Amino acid sequence: MPIRHCIVHLIDKKPDGTPAVLHARDSELAESAAIENLLADLNDSYNAKQGKAWGFFHAESGAYPFSGWLKEYFDGSQDFTSFSRVAIKHLQTLMEASNLSTGGHVLFAHYQQGMTEYLAIALLHHSEGVAVNAELDVTPSRHLDLGQLHLAARINLSEWKNNQNSKQYISFIKGKNGKKVSEYFRDFIGCQEGVDGPGETRTLLKAFSDYVEKEDLPEESAREKTQTLVDYATAQTKLGEPVTLEELSSLIDEDRPKAFYDHIRNSDYGLSPEIPADKRTLNQFRRFTGRAEGLSISFEAHLLGEKIEYDEAAGTLIIKGLPTQLIDQLKRR
């Protein structure tokens, strides 16, 4: 993963309402194994985050100047350090206006993954821990806590440059229930939501269910294809990459690689050729779950119709082949 440019600034903002203080770095970080490890860990943490949203830039304006500065950097009108410094000052201003925000170290990284260039921006926080030093004393230790990554965005620079009609070249952490605490960061990027990741994923899964029904697939084949879809989509979310419908179609049916893709296109589901899969929605598709007072049921989707029968009119489930452990417990009751 070649790192083209990387820099870290610090915005010191206390929760007591005092003005935020900016400590801006004057030069880029030198290449090092530590920087490479940091960015790799950041990517892993970011890709694993649930609740991300996808979108595109607002038109450049006084309220949303970030895309203009990014364009100047990308066109060579200003260097990376200058771009990051003017951007971090804008973030400082927005932080001061937000009562919900706290400061921290802000990372800007321009890197390449495969043939694609990205810009990652993340607000990093620290955690206090302990360490053992060379004298074998236990001492306090402060470290970056990427598990507490709540404000971050990633811009697909290649997509932004080459596909002006795209509405999903920016991804950002939206937070649980779209927390307002993240709004100032989204405004800093100047991003508007263009793609509903969970909604697109639900539509994809609906299209797949319709396809299985239309093809009248045997139970074993349907189960295998379901697993193929979930495995591929889950792998793409871990990589931070979208689900490509044509690639998915070829994996679902190697003998007829266009069959599922043609089904989607001919049925007009309104799906884009590439969609950002939502991990939470995929997990729900993998299993059926339900809870009531004193009762919890969870089973894999492919068991429905095989070991589990659902009677909608009666509101009952019939479970065949109970686990031996459960049978033993029932006998001992």
Curated annotation (Swiss-Prot):
- Which controlled-vocabulary keywords does the entry list? Cytoplasm
Output the Gene Ontology cellular-component terms: bacterial nucleoid; cytoplasm
Tell me, in one coarse class, where this protein mainly resides.
cytoplasm
Which InterPro entries would you find in this protein's record?
Answer: Nucleoid_associated_NdpA
Species in which this protein is naturally found: Pseudomonas savastanoi pv. phaseolicola (strain 1448A / Race 6) (Pseudomonas syringae pv. phaseolicola (strain 1448A / Race 6))
Under HAMAP family, the record lists: NdpA (MF_00730)
**Entry superkingdom:** Bacteria
Q: What is this protein called?
A: Nucleoid-associated protein PSPPH_1145
UniProt similarity note: Belongs to the YejK family.
Task: Extract the GO molecular function terms from the UniProt entry.
Answer: double-stranded DNA binding; single-stranded RNA binding
Where is it located?
Cytoplasm, Nucleoid
